[in-house]
From Swiss-Prot:
Binds 2 heme b groups non-covalently. The gene is MT-CYB. It is found in: Mitochondrion inner membrane. It comes from the Eukaryota. Heme b b562 binds at H84, H183. This is Cytochrome b. Pfam families: Cytochrom_B_C, Cytochrome_B. Keywords: Electron transport, Heme, Iron, Membrane, Metal-binding, Mitochondrion, Mitochondrion inner membrane, Respiratory chain, Transmembrane, Transmembrane helix, Transport, Ubiquinone. GO terms for molecular function: metal ion binding; ubiquinol-cytochrome-c reductase activity. One of its GO terms (biological process) is mitochondrial electron transport, ubiquinol to cytochrome c. Belongs to the cytochrome b family. A ubiquinone binds at H202. Heme 1 (or BL or b562) is low-potential and absorbs at about 562 nm, and heme 2 (or BH or b566) is high-potential and absorbs at about 566 nm.
Length: 380
């Protein structure tokens, strides 16, 4: 029998073992589609970003004009820019759902996979932040000023660190240049960490909705899950293209249509929608260093999740109390997102503080408590 090149070629066999002959649990649901959707988002963002970079000028006097030029004069430039801007939103929608799936089904017990995933989230957030500065509109400039300024809360080295990051005494041309360099570099770093993420995942194999071993019943990834992923892809691309083609500026801030002006502060400085939950937590603490620590903790808390798992069952499939708590957490995050978009005044301040407190309470105190309680109820 002739050797199958797919299984013998040094490069093709790696692809084969990851995407074709990969043994996959037979019962994973549509919630397992988001990994491949994230890969597609990354590829889309790199391609559109590369095309945009060909027409972009990283200079404070030209950046805003170069983006306007791309939209007006470059063939399909408007489309490339809108795909890239809204592609970021869909990237975050997918990653939030992917993390939510991991929380619900106990996927975080694969610690290496989970930790590399958290690193991917942090890198994605950094990439999105530096990218938002590049069009050099009002919200770009003031967003960069406010967020980089947070580093000055670090004791002793803070101010030096901020001026070093800025390349001067304020957000200016050096800042824009280095942010462009970082925004170009980081997606490739994300691609590299993604490969590490997958390597760790394929060491153990995928989890499944029941949280039990799948070893007795595995099926090849292709054609079963390749076709399922393509369906998921189509279902994601329909709303993505609808948003991009019908209301491309729906998620953007009107302030960003004005060129950056250091002398005029916008009435409400706020980040893109996908950072609002963390921004609300930052603002809920009336102390600069405390706010920065809470902001960092709001994402880094994910690293603690594997250690807070007290249940004898892996997933929440058969744990109604934990399920209730999980959806409470989701509602809580939606409230935080809403609060982050509101001005700092009554009643939003107290709502934000309550939501921030309950966010940390649910994750750090209530989840382990309910897990232990469920064990007792089930006589474990």
């Amino acid at each position: 029998m002739a050797p199958n090149i797919r299984k013998s070629h040094p490069l093709l066999k790696m692809i084969n073992n990851s995407l074709i002959d990969l043994p996959t649990p037979s019962n994973i649901s549509a919630w397992w589609n988001f990994g491949s959707l994230l890969a597609v988002c990354l590829i889309t963002q790199i391609l559109t970003g590369l095309l945009l970079a060909m027409h972009y000028t990283a200079d404070t006097t030209l950046a805003f004009s170069s983006v306007a030029h791309t939209c007006r004069n470059v063939q399909y430039g408007w489309l490339i820019r809108n795909l890239h801007a809204n592609g970021a939103s869909f990237f975050f929608i997918c990653i939030f759902l992917h993390i939510g799936r991991g929380l619900y089904y106990g996927s975080y017990l694969y610690k290496e996979t989970w930790n590399t995933g958290v690193i991917l989230l942090l890198t994605l957030m950094a990439t999105a932040f530096v990218g938002y500065v590049l069009p050099w509109g009002q919200m770009s400039f003031w967003g960069a000023t406010v967020i980089t300024n947070l580093f000055s809360a670090i004791p002793y080295i803070g101010q030096t660190l901020v001026e070093w990051a800025w390349g001067g005494f304020s957000v200016d041309n050096p800042t824009l240049t280095r942010f462009f360099a970082l925004h170009f570099l980081l997606p490739f770093v994300i691609a590299g960490i993604t490969i590490i993420h997958l390597t760790f995942l394929h060491e153990s194999g995928s989890n499944n909705p029941l949280g039990i071993s799948s070893n007795s019943d595995k099926i090849p990834f292709h054609p079963y899950y390749s076709i399922k992923d393509i369906l998921g892809l189509a279902l994601m691309f329909i709303p993505f293209l609808t948003l991009t083609l019908f209301s491309p500026n729906f998620l953007g801030d009107p302030e960003n249509f004005s060129p950056a002006n250091p002398l005029v502060t916008p009435p409400h400085i706020k980040p893109e929608w996908y950072f609002l939950f963390a921004y609300a937590i930052l603002r809920s603490i009336p102390n600069k260093l405390g706010g920065v620590l809470a902001l960092a903790a709001s994402v880094l808390i994910l690293l603690l999740i594997p250690f807070l798992h007290k249940s004898k069952q892996r997933t929440m499939t058969f744990r109604p109390l934990s399920q209730t708590l999980f959806w409470l957490l989701v509602a809580n995050l939606l409230i935080l997102t809403w609060i982050g978009s509101q001005p700092v005044e009554h009643p939003f301040i107290i709502i934000g503080q309550m939501a921030s407190l309950s966010y940390f309470s649910i994750l750090l105190i209530l989840f382990p408590m309910i897990g232990t309680l469920e064990n007792k109820i089930l006589n474990y």
